[in-house]
């Protein structure tokens, strides 16, 4: 099972749709959590759903024929054979999140997470060498899907550390 993760707005769901069109069995971790009731509650301050990641990941392991799991928490599943972290320049990400109507506080929280490599760091702490990092900035969804397909087939390697948006925080 390959897990595709990244800050909300980087293109995971769009990419998942393309991979599905290419014949892969893809599931959204967020949808699974909501549909199967793997919800522990709601964060009282930020309003986010708190997911039972262990239960959701355990359920994923039992699913047959599953190729890809996408979601901004998917890298927390220890059973991922490979993790691909999608990255996007924070200014481009800002436009997407604002376009979705995210409140300013949520936008800023996600921009900071992207600039600080939060998903990449978390993924690397759990999965080490099995983590790849892809900068989607300026690339079409189909170009990103081609890169992901190459990574999955072993013909391309995109090790973590090659994408750095930390300077955005200082600018």
Curated annotation (Swiss-Prot):
EC assignment: 2.7.4.3
Catalytic activity: AMP + ATP = 2 ADP; ATP + H2O = ADP + phosphate + H(+)
GO biological process, alphabetically ordered: ribosomal small subunit biogenesis; rRNA processing
Keywords: ATP-binding, Kinase, Nucleotide-binding, Ribosome biogenesis, rRNA processing, Transferase
Region described as LID: 99-109
InterPro entries xrefs: Adenyl_kinase_AK6 (IPR020618), P-loop_NTPase (IPR027417)
GO molecular function: adenylate kinase activity; ATP binding; ATP hydrolysis activity
Enzyme class: transferase
Binding partners and assembly: Interacts with uS11. Not a structural component of 40S pre-ribosomes, but transiently interacts with them by binding to uS11.
Name recorded for this polypeptide: Putative adenylate kinase
Annotated source species: Methanothermobacter thermautotrophicus (strain ATCC 29096 / DSM 1053 / JCM 10044 / NBRC 100330 / Delta H) (Methanobacterium thermoautotrophicum)
Organism taxonomic ancestry: Archaea, Methanobacteriati, Methanobacteriota, Methanomada group, Methanobacteria
């Amino acid at each position: 099972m390959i897990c595709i993760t990244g800050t909300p707005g980087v293109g995971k769901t769009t990419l998942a749709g393309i991979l599905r069109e290419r014949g892969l069995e893809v599931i959204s971790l967020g949808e699974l959590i909501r549909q199967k009731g793997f919800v522990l509650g709601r964060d009282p301050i930020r309003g986010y759903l708190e997911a039972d990641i262990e239960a959701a990941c355990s359920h994923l392991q039992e699913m047959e024929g599953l190729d890809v799991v996408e979601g901004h928490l998917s890298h927390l599943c220890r059973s991922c054979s490979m993790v691909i972290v999608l990255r996007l320049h924070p200014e481009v990400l800002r436009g997407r999140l604002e376009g979705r109507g995210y409140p300013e506080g949520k936008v800023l929280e996600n921009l900071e997470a992207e600039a600080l490599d939060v998903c990449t760091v978390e993924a690397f702490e759990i999965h080490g060498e099995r983590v790849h990092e892809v900068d989607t900035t300026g690339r079409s969804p189909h170009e990103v899907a081609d890169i992901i397909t190459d990574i999955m087939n072993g013909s391309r390697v995109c090790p973590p550390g090659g994408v750095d948006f930390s300077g955005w925080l200082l600018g």
